[in-house]
Structures are given as C-alpha cells and as structure tokens.
Amino acid sequence: MSPRHRARARRSVVCAAVAAAALVTGSVAAGAYSLGRSPDAASRAVSSAPPSESPSRTPEAAEVTVDLDTVLAAAVEPVVARSGASLSVAVLDTKSGESAVYGEKTYDTASIVKVDILAALLLAAQDAGRSLTAEEKTQAAAMIRLSDNTAATALWQTIGGARGLDAANERLGLTETAGAGAWGLTQTTARDQLALLQAVFGTNSVLSEASRTYLQTLMEQISTDQDWGVSAAGSGWALKNGWMPRTATGLWDVNSIGRVSVDGRVCLVAVLSDGHATKEAGIALVEAAARKAVSSL
C-alpha cells in the first residue's frame, strides 16, 4: 500500500472512531436518549473494521429520540425531593410544539380556577352572541388581577357552578378537571392546566380572538404582590396564581399557571403543588420547578 493510501486509511478509521465515541458519550451523558445502534455495537463495528476498508464507507447514521418527560423529571425530581412536598409541572414551547409533563397527581386548583371560570363565562357569552356586561367585566378584572374571592363566587354562580365549569371544560379540551361544590376545591392536573393555557393563548381554540385577548390582558396585569410563580422563569409573563391552606392538615396548596418568554421562546407553564409548611416555601418550590421546566426544553 502506498503512503498516500495508508494515510487515507488511517483517516477513515479515526473518523469512524470519533463518530462512534460521540454516540457512546451522548448515550451515557443523557440517559434519556435512545440510539438506533447500541454503543457497544457501534464500538465493535469500529474496532473490527479492517485498516484497508474503503474511505468512502462511514458508520450508519444513528436515529436519536428524546423522551422529554424523562428529561423534565430528571431536572425537577431533585428539587421536589428536598422539599418534602408534592408537585407536578407541565410545559410547552409554543414555537416548536415540544411539551413535557412531570407528575400525574390531581390537585386542588385554589385560585388558578379563576382563569377557567372566566374562560367559561366568555364561552357562554360567545354562545349568546353578546359581550360581557359592565358588572361582569368589573368582577372579571377583580377576580383575575386581584384574585378577589367575592368576584369569583359571583361569576361561579353566573356560569352555573361546577356543572357549568365542567360543560365548558369539555369544549375547552380539559379532560382531567372536575368542578366541586366550592370553586377552590375544583380538582385538576398540570396536564389539563396546560390544555387550558393552550385554549387561552393558542389560536386553535373555541374561544374567539377577542375572548382570548381579553383574558390574556387581565393575566398580564396581575397585582404586583401576586406576580410570583411561573413569572420567575422568564419575562413577558401573563399568569394566575393560587394558594390555600388546607384546614385538615394546615399545609398549603400553591399553584401557578401562565405564559413566559425565555431567550426568544414563548412557553406555557403550569405548576401545581401541595403539602407545604408555609406559603413562602410553596412559592419558592413552584418558582424553582418553573425555571427547571423551561430550561429542560
């Protein structure tokens, strides 16, 4: 073999080895990656290739898939484990369409249900071909911006309570949410709250553009003493939080849902949690989980 042919053969083997090493490293480091060829098989293919193999032949391209739920769990679980509380989070990148969910537990909504109540009211108004009344607008603004409970109770009655909420949610795409005798005890999941956010902030929604814009605007005007939660994960936020101590245990439910902008991306995030010793501890955990969720995508 001429010197030029020997040099060409050495380059072929080195390139193949580097490609195989990259596959092995990616598999070990990420854990959540599934490769078309196992790392061992790739290593054997390179090490067994004869030196005289033609330079034009390269290892087959490996198909790589990522389980984003697994990636999200790896990011969030250490934070939750240290807290002693229970938490579920769902996140969606609106541009790529990629989403992930951690946790399947059902939680009390507390005041995040106020977004759902207003969505149900707007849907009913659309059906009737009318705008909200002046009184309804006043109540809606107080309910979302200030988290006013009296306004929420009034609008809860207007939409028909739990039955009216459930009927609206069937149309909004929520399948894991059930209204209760008291609006704050409505049961939901992070996955379903993400579906609600898609109905509010997406374009493929039974809510009209005018209804969506109205709800979004109120969520962008949250009182400054309530602008915590998913807003910690980015800027340009619109959100609604919920917090409630449970009488039976003295422990807190702390939830946050909304939209944030991060590094040019727009994400929808829902974080639900319970079992906190204090409201402040719950807020800290919710914000940490929101940041982890957005960065995991």
Question: Can you annotate each of these PLM segments?
Answer:
Residues S2-R4, R8-S27, G31-P51, D67-L87, ...:
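Penicillin-recognizing serine hydrolase domain
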Residues S47-A62, E98-Y102, L118-L121, R145-D148:
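Acidic/histidine-rich, surface-exposed loop or edge segments in extracytoplasmic proteins
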Residues V91, V101-L118, E136, A154:
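Hydrophobic alpha-helical segments that drive targeting, anchoring, or assembly
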Residues G97, T106-R130, M143, V269:
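Active-site SXXK
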Residues A125-A178:
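Conserved catalytic neighborhood of penicillin-recognizing serine enzymes
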